[in-house]
Amino acid sequence: MKMMIPVIFSILLLIFSLSSTAMSLEDEQENMEERAEIDFSGIPEDIIKQIKETNAKPPARFDPAAFEKSDD
């Protein structure tokens, strides 16, 4: 019986983690859809092309390795 409590607690934490991950992925998908629905009337074609190329890229992630000094 003593082992049941930690097992149940672990399962609940896993379920919560998976559901919050799914919700954040859903929010990111909605944000990408909103960026795709921008009204571009009255804007030059070259600027529209640059905006669409930027919006097609995945969101930037911080990479601490990019700031490390190399010993070479």
From Swiss-Prot:
Keywords: Bradykinin receptor impairing toxin, G-protein coupled receptor impairing toxin, Hypotensive agent, Phosphoprotein, Secreted, Signal, Toxin. The modification Phosphoserine is found at residue 41. This is Hypotensin-1. The primary structure of this cryptide TyPep-1 is identical to that of cryptide Pep-1 from Tityus obscurus (AC P0DRE6). One of its GO terms (biological process) is regulation of blood pressure. Expressed by the venom gland. Residues 1-24 form the signal peptide. The keyword Signal applies. It comes from Tityus serrulatus (Brazilian scorpion). Residues 25-35, 61-72 form a propeptide. GO terms for molecular function: toxin activity.
